[in-house]
A protein has these predicted regions:
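Conserved PLP-enzyme active-site core in the AAT-like
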Residues: 1-202
Length: 203
């Protein structure tokens, strides 16, 4: 999951960029600086919010403060949303869209840390499309490990133009395994006949 998030952010953010996320986001609290490392130095800029969720109003205020100092400060880079959050709360598709609307008003791409994405879908009662690209998400870290798979995550990139850069960064970062088919086989079974959703409903 850490690699999925960090490599995803690396294709969205320059080394001098800012990644806006909640102060209790997994990329801030539990990834040992991996996003900063894989992006080449991008800064995580923290956003407050009750129950580990950002609000559009607070996100807008924080984004507005960053990147206005010219060469002396980090530039606006991307927004990362954790869904479900580290506190177990869930953004609805409408709430994701509201955050993405703020992001797009500053021309910022949106990343979703979906380590518990399936749990969020089940709780919100929406489709994967409604929670992601239809709501303005550009890249999804799609978790399998926290829902029954063994060491398997996927990254879903909705802009095909970004996919090749991700492939190169994955290889360079040591995450292209020679026996990757054994991981892919898990994901294939996971997504067949709704197994992933049944597991999430039981969790």
């Amino acid at each position: 999951g850490t690699a999925a998030n960090a490599l995803s952010l690396a294709i969205l953010t320059d080394p001098w960029g800012a990644v806006f996320c909640h102060r209790h986001a997994h990329i801030e609290e539990d990834e040992c600086g991996a996003p900063e490392f894989y992006t080449g130095g991008a800064k995580l800029v923290l956003v407050d919010g009750a129950h580990a969720k950002m609000s559009p109003e607070t996100l807008r205020k924080v984004i507005a403060r960053v990147g206005s100092g010219g060469v002396h400060g980090v530039q606006r880079g991307a927004v990362s949303i954790t869904n479900a959050t580290e506190n177990g709360t869930v953004y609805s598709a409408q709430q994701v869209w509201a955050l993405a609307e703020v992001s797009k008003s500053y021309n910022l791409p949106v990343h979703m840390d979906g380590a518990r994405f399936t749990n969020a879908l089940v709780r919100a009662g929406c489709t994967p499309a409604e929670m992601t690209w239809k709501a303005g998400v550009d890249v999804l870290s799609f978790g399998g490990t926290k829902n029954g798979c063994m060491g398997v995550e996927a990254v879903v990139i909705f802009d095909p133009a970004k996919a090749w850069e991700f492939e190169l960064r994955r290889k360079r970062g040591g995450h292209l395994f020679s026996k990757h088919r054994y991981l892919s086989a898990q994901m294939d079974a996971y997504l067949t006949d709704g197994l992933w959703l049944r597991l999430a409903r039981a969790a």
